Structure formats: structure tokens, C-alpha cells
Amino acid sequence: MRLAFMGTPDFAVPALHALHEAGHEIAVVYSQPPRPAGRGQAVRPQPVHLAAEALGIPVRVPTRLRANHDEHAFFRALDLDAAVVAAYGLILPGAMLTPRAGARLNVHASLLPRWRGAAPIQAAILAGDDESGVTIMQMDEGLDTGAMLLTGRVALTPATTASTLHDDLAAMGGRLIVAALANSETAAIPQPAEGATYAARLTREDGRIDWTRDAVDIDRQVRALTPWPGTFTTLDGTVLKIGAATPIDGPRDAVPGTVLDDRLTVACGQGTLRLTRIQRPGRGMMEADAFLRGQPVPVGTRLGS
């Protein structure tokens, strides 16, 4: 098939590679424009942009698609069989949704209609879901509301992190989009209205730890929001990022946020949480024992106050 591929972050790269390896003609790749990244804030192309260039595929990086009539005309002139979207980050206007049946496909990292929106991987972990997955859906002008073609499922465990789930679902998305294009007879199933939920775009403030919450919920927050936007608390006014933690049994009458022992076990609203990976300003993420050698934290210290 002659395709356009639209994607931006690392999540979309396996789908691009899978389509290329399956022998599809990828006429053009759309990605969001290069942006500052890393400590030096150097302007860098997005991961999909780099992957497409490595494959020798032309790349377009418009800053907007709505009311971009020149881009609409270019897109129509491509004479595509299908357009595949995976975490592109811009909503396609109607003028860029090719009318061919089954040819407007999106790779979405959730079991729709649960977790439509921008952050489905993190939302599934935050909510304590038992499973997540990938849905291949036909695109319409709604937000992840189109009819579903294929789904793949993966179980979530108390050890699942956003990073591990991201990689599992990215690989699954590549396999499923190739399968969807190979079987044009797959029936599209409209999404049910019941069970629809939305995963809002994350902000840095979503990572602030509220120690009055249950230890299990805070553990989910750490696993869901590492590396972005990261979970954090404060120690004497200094921001500490928390990279990993473990809920454990502990006293129920301690003030939330109180350090209970010399292993950085912290009282929560329900239960206790042992911090196992920590980062202070200007340093890399480190194990708790290494952190404590350079920054002793006395028993009774209050975090987040």
C-alpha cells in the first residue's frame, strides 16, 4: 500500500519500522517540528523524524494542520491508499482524512473506549487497571472515538512502570497496524458509549506527592509518572524526585510524610512507602543508600511540608 505515516515520539517508531519492513510504500512522514531537548536544550528533530530520515523517507513538520490549505492540497495530491497515525500530537482536520474505507487508521495505547486522550499509558497505571493494550481504530474527527478494528492486551502488575508498558505497547502497535492493513475484511466495531474515560495531558504538578494518600496510590503515581513528568516531594524546601518506591507494612498512626526509619520509609495516609530511588537537584537518580550517604535524613523528618 501507498501510505502516509504521522507520528512524533518514541512510541510511534516501532510502527513506522514495522510498516516499512512489511513492504509498504511510505510516501511521506509527518512529525511535529524539532524542539529544544535535554540539559543543553539543543533543538533536535523528534524520534519519528529521525527514524524516517534514516529510512530515506521524506519528512514534513508543519506547526499546524487546521486551516493549512497548502498542506491539505499537498496531502490530497499524494494519492494514498491509507494514512496511519500513532501519537502524532496534532488532530487531523476533515480535509486530511482520506475518504477511502478503512484507510484512516490510528494506533492508540489503550483498550478503547477506556483512556481516550493524551496520556493513556500513565492513566492505566494510576488507576490500578488490571490490563492495558493497543487499539487500532478508524479515525474520525472526534478524540479517539472511531470504530475499532483490532485490539491487543497486556496484563498490568504491581511492578509495571510507564517505561516498560510504553515499550510493550509500542512493539504491539507495530504488529497490530501491519495486521490491520493486511486484512481489509476486518469488521470495524463502533466504540460503546459505556466505559469511556479520558486521560488528560500531564503537567509537572501531577507529579507532586500528597503524603495523605494511600501508599499503594503513591506507588502507582511513581510508576506511572517516571520519567515524565516525574514524581517529587520536598525536603527542607529542596525538591527531591522519586524514581522508585515500595509499599510496605508499617505503623498507622504516624503523621503522613514523616520519615520512620533510616531506610527512608515514609508514613502515608494509609500504609507506608519505602523510597528506593531518589534524585536531588543537579545530580542523577541514585539508590536510596547512596543518597543517604550524601544527605542524611533523620527519623522524624517531614517530607513535603
From Swiss-Prot:
GO cellular component: cytosol
GO molecular function: methionyl-tRNA formyltransferase activity
Domain of life of the native organism: Bacteria
Pfam families the record matches: Formyl_trans_C (PF02911), Formyl_trans_N (PF00551)
Name of protein: Methionyl-tRNA formyltransferase
E.C. code: 2.1.2.9
Gene: fmt
Catalytic reaction annotation: L-methionyl-tRNA(fMet) + (6R)-10-formyltetrahydrofolate = N-formyl-L-methionyl-tRNA(fMet) + (6S)-5,6,7,8-tetrahydrofolate + H(+)
Function as written in the Swiss-Prot or TrEMBL entry: Attaches a formyl group to the free amino group of methionyl-tRNA(fMet). The formyl group appears to play a dual role in the initiator identity of N-formylmethionyl-tRNA by promoting its recognition by IF2 and preventing the misappropriation of this tRNA by the elongation apparatus.
Record-linked Gene3D superfamilies: Formyl transferase, C-terminal domain, Formyl transferase, N-terminal domain
Binding site for (6S)-5,6,7,8-tetrahydrofolate: S110, L111, L112, P113
PROSITE patterns referenced in this protein's UniProt entry, alphabetically: GART (PS00373)
Family: Belongs to the Fmt family.
Coiled coil: none
UniProt keyword list: Protein biosynthesis, Transferase
